[in-house]
Amino acid sequence: SLFSFALNAKDYRPGIDYQFLDEEVQTRNPEKIEVIEFFWLGCGHCFTLEGLIRDWKKNLNKDIDFWRVPVTWNPPAKEHAKLFYAAEALGMEEIIGSAFTSIHLDRKFLTSEREITELFSAFGVEPDKYQAISNSFRIKSNINAADVYGRKYEIMGVPAFIVNGKYKVKASRDIPTEKLLDVVDHLVDIERSQ
C-alpha cells in the first residue's frame, strides 16, 4: 500500500543509507532492474552476507538482473577473483561457499595456486582442468572487467551493491551488513514503481 511504502521510504535515507551515483551508468540489460554485488572472498562482512545472498537469490523476481563482481585491489583479491570466475565458468557455485568457509572458518586463506587447486580438487576438478580454466583468456578478461567496474563505481569497500546504475549501498554505522539487502530491496521497489 501507499502508506507502507511511505513508511519504508522514511526508513532509508539518501546520502545516509545509500548514495546516488554521481552519474547514472547504463546497465547491461535495460529491460531489467540490475543489482551488482561487489565482494571479496577474504572479507568477513561478505562472508556474513553470503548465506543471506543465497536465500535472497532464491526469491528474486524475473525483473531483476543480479550479478556479482569480485574486487581486484591486490594480489590476494586477484587470486580470489580468479577462483570465483573459474567456479562460475564450471557452473560450480558451491565452490564459492566452500571458499568463504575455508578462508573464514578453516583459516586457509587460498592465496596460493596450490591451496586453490586443492579446493577445486575436493569438488572433483582435476588440477590440469583448473589450471587451464583459471589461466584462460575468458577468466583474464573477466578479471580485467571486474577491475574496470570497481573503478567505474568507485568501490572503496565491500560488500557494496550498485542498484540499476543509480544507487550505491554499502555497510555503514547506520546500515549493518545484515540490513544491506533490505536497502537494496527498497531501491528495487523504487525503480520498479517508476
List where the protein language model places each region.
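Extracytoplasmic thiol/disulfide redox context detector
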Residues: 1-75, 151-152, 186-194
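Sec/Tat-exported extracytoplasmic proteins
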Residues: 39-42, 57-60, 87-91, 103-107, ...
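Solvent-exposed loop/turn segments at secondary-structure junctions
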Residues: 41-45, 72-76, 102-106, 138-139, ...
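Extracytoplasmic/secreted envelope proteins and their assembly/folding machinery
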Residues: 50-57, 80-84, 96, 113, ...
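Alpha-helix N-cap and coil->helix boundary residues
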Residues: 94-95, 111, 129, 158
